[in-house]
UniProtKB/Swiss-Prot annotation:
Co-factor(s): FAD
Keywords: FAD, Flavoprotein, NAD, Oxidoreductase
Enzyme kind, highest EC tier: oxidoreductase
Designated name of the protein: NAD(P)H dehydrogenase (quinone)
UniProt-listed GO biological process terms: cellular detoxification
Misc. comment: Catalysis proceeds by a classical ping-pong bi-bi reaction mechanism.
Record field: catalytic activity: a quinone + NADH + H(+) = a quinol + NAD(+); a quinone + NADPH + H(+) = a quinol + NADP(+)
EC number(s) on file: 1.6.5.2
Function, as annotated: May contribute to virulence by increasing resistance to reactive oxygen intermediates. It can reduce 2,6-dimethyl-1,4-benzoquinone (DMBQ), 5-hydroxy-1,4-naphthaquinone (5-HNQ) and menadione. NADPH is the physiological reductant rather than NADH.
InterPro entries for the chain: FAD/NAD-bd_sf, FAD/NAD-binding_dom, FAD/NAD-linked_Rdtase_dimer_sf, Pyr_nuc-diS_OxRdtase, Pyr_nucl-diS_OxRdtase_dimer
Subunit structure: Homotetramer.
Amino acid sequence: MVTRIVILGGGPAGYEAALVAATSHPETTQVTVIDCDGIGGAAVLDDCVPSKTFIASTGLRTELRRAPHLGFHIDFDDAKISLPQIHARVKTLAAAQSADITAQLLSMGVQVIAGRGELIDSTPGLARHRIKATAADGSTSEHEADVVLVATGASPRILPSAQPDGERILTWRQLYDLDALPDHLIVVGSGVTGAEFVDAYTELGVPVTVVASQDHVLPYEDADAALVLEESFAERGVRLFKNARAASVTRTGAGVLVTMTDGRTVEGSHALMTIGSVPNTSGLGLERVGIQLGRGNYLTVDRVSRTLATGIYAAGDCTGLLPLASVAAMQGRIAMYHALGEGVSPIRLRTVAATVFTRPEIAAVGVPQSVIDAGSVAARTIMLPLRTNARAKMSEMRHGFVKIFCRRSTGVVIGGVVVAPIASELILPIAVAVQNRITVNELAQTLAVYPSLSGSITEAARRLMAHDDLDCTAAQDAAEQLALVPHHLPTSN
């Protein structure tokens, strides 16, 4: 019997789910992906891949600024910036990634339909569902499905009094159409997206002002990490309005005017709105299958991505779980394995590593320090500045640190934070420790290359060790050694 699967949305959740179905059950599944924005979704075409490509280009200026300290006297101002070339590279790479994913899906026998999908069941509670796909030219097709995965993603949140025009008032998806650098960029919002673009544009020499709703940037990230980033921003001349919310953003003759709720104003040439996202859950016909949207119009799912409607799953940013491509992809895979009757392990959010791609990068995994400080989790903590690391000194790295958290009684690693130029890579050993419940002693006994930035992770683990950890490890080692010794039991005559 063939299981017919229709996936609404071709982003990480959608295409990963399609690949799972097509590769694990190729003889018994018929997979269709309906997508109106392009395979890869916003993560590949508009958000994650483009922004990180843009950041990679601007990062070259970071190295140039460090060059004089390393004996290379390069005139920083001679590094001419071709913004059209940078943007062309961003768009080319995103399109190529989308094409690669599309080709992979097609090679696996997945049907890809360009259009918008909508559930058209005649009544709630049906075991099989009907979906209508509407193409850009208005033509339609209908499809039956035993399993439906809603993976429609999210879009930039729009402030009614700050309508983006694609010229001066922008969302992060419109930046790559600019022909020239802003004379003065105002970034409204200081979360992950806002912080990343503040960092990138200051590296390009653009004066930047930030309107932050909290008393520091990155309000939902590690407080010490946010402080390091604020210091880095201050060194580059970033002007920061704290505890400020934008009431409106309007066009002026020369640019834009941002008016805050407390009456303060700031003028600039361009405004970038980074005030969060809203789920793409309207117009999908969800009410026809008995699904009611939850808070913020997100789809409510359980830990294996099921909705309350039979045979209908949801994954990715439309569920509001965590706005990360890695989480969306994992949700999609879990949903499809479960739908096909495979055993699955529910997603564990405490094992998800995330990175803010600023300079320095900020990466974290597991239990945050704020939870520990609040007394909710009994833990030991360590914070080791990166400036003590020999490799960091060699490269003139002045900002950053490594944090590790472990359970007070057992020494099991439960979380950590890395602030460093390549924190997105360095967080992996801590994430592995959290995932596999490794102790700080086991992490400390791992031999790190010298000199290396990863050496700070093992050094932090050593400093976090307690005498009880050593006693437990000694007993464990003795038991393991004993197990290796042949035991010749006496035999009776």
